Each structure stands twice: as structure tokens, then as C-alpha cells.
């Protein structure tokens, strides 16, 4: 992609789980122009600071790989494992805004992002079994219900399912 195609309206997506943190920069038409991956961090166990450090590194890598400046990011969406309780989303959003110096940020549990990435309709449910396990249900009115952090870690995730 050459520099003339850039219109200053990019979306930054961040996906953080226990194994990895991935970030992608895309144009408004969905074409991905830059990606980066760093270590994972589950903030309820490893701390918010560590999670933010990994998200910032992945985001900055994706922006650099896209060949744009942070000021060209119009909107950021972060799907973060561990956003399970009321207020977690706002806490992560505010911390990301401060760390990355970006404006519009939406943060939610990564299962919500997983649901919308494959949904054929606006409501339904998804279960995600990665390093950990969580799920989300979105009802016909758009209300989100997240299930996560209710089980012992050794009893959840893909490795527990394989036992």
C-alpha cells in the first residue's frame, strides 16, 4: 500500500489472552495494513501493568508495521481476557488511553469480540477455550453477559478439555 492511499482513518484492534497479545491496524474497509504479536498476560493474575505493557508493545508494533503514526488511529477496540466483572472494561479502557495516548477506545472481554467476529446475527452465544476458558452471551436487546473466572485454572481451557 502506498502512502497516497492513507486517509488518516485507521482502526487498531488488540486481542489479549493468556498466551499472546496480538494487534492489527486496518483501514476502515477492513484491509489489514500492519500486525504485531507479543507475550500474553492475564491481568487478574499477572497484574494490570504487565497486561498494559504487552498491549502497548503489540499496538506500537502494529502501528509501526503499518507505517502510520498513532495520530492516524481513529478508534481502538481491545478484547481482553479477564474483563469479567463490572467496571473491568472501563478500568482497562482508561489505563489503555493513558498508556497509548489514543482517543476513542472500547474494551471488552475477548469472548465478546470472538462472538461478533463469527456471528451471523446480532444475538447468540460463544464459548472460547484457549489458555483459559470464557464465554459470552448477547441477547436480542444487545445486552452482554460474560462468563469467565469462575473455575479453577487447571480445570479450564483447551488443555483441560483434552484431559
Task: Give the positions of each predicted feature.
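Short glycine-aspartate micro-motif
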Residues: 11-15, 73-77, 124-128
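Residues on a specific face of well-ordered alpha-helices
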Residues: 53, 57, 94, 113, ...
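Active-site phosphate-binding/coordination module
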Residues: 94-99, 128, 138, 143
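Short beta-strand-loop/turn "lid" adjacent to the catalytic site in phosphate-handling enzymes
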Residues: 59, 63-99, 118-119
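Glycine/GP-enriched mid-protein hinge/lid loop-to-helix segment characteristic of carbohydrate kinases
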Residues: 47, 123, 134-163
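Short glycine-rich, Thr/Ser-proximal phosphate-binding strand/loop in the N-terminal lobe
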Residues: 7-53, 57, 143-145, 150-151
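Short beta-strand scaffold segments in enzyme catalytic cores
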Residues: 21-26, 116, 127, 133-138
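Conserved phosphate-binding catalytic cores of ATP/NTP-utilizing and phosphoryl-transfer enzymes
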Residues: 1-7, 102-126
Amino acid at each position: 500500500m502506498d502512502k497516497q492511499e492513507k486517509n488518516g482513518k485507521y482502526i487498531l484492534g488488540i486481542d489479549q489472552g493468556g498466551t499472546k497479545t496480538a494487534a492489527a491496524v486496518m483501514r476502515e474497509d477492513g484491509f489489514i495494513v500492519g500486525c504485531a504479536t507479543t507475550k500474553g498476560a492475564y491481568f487478574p493474575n499477572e497484574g494490570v501493568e504487565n497486561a498494559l505493557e504487552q498491549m502497548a508493545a503489540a499496538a506500537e508494533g502494529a502501528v509501526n508495521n503499518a507505517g502510520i503514526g498513532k495520530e492516524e488511529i481513529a478508534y481502538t477496540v481491545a478484547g481482553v481476557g479477564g474483563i469479567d466483572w463490572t467496571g473491568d472494561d472501563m478500568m482497562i479502557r482508561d489505563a489503555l488511553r493513558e498508556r497509548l495516548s489514543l482517543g476513542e477506545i472500547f474494551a471488552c472481554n475477548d469472548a465478546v469480540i470472538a462472538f461478533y467476529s463469527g456471528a451471523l446475527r446480532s444475538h447468540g452465544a460463544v464459548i472460547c477455550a484457549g489458555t483459559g476458558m470464557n464465554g459470552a452471551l448477547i441477547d436480542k436487546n444487545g445486552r452482554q453477559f460474560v462468563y469467565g473466572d469462575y473455575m479453577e485454572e487447571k480445570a479450564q481451557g483447551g488443555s483441560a478439555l483434552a484431559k
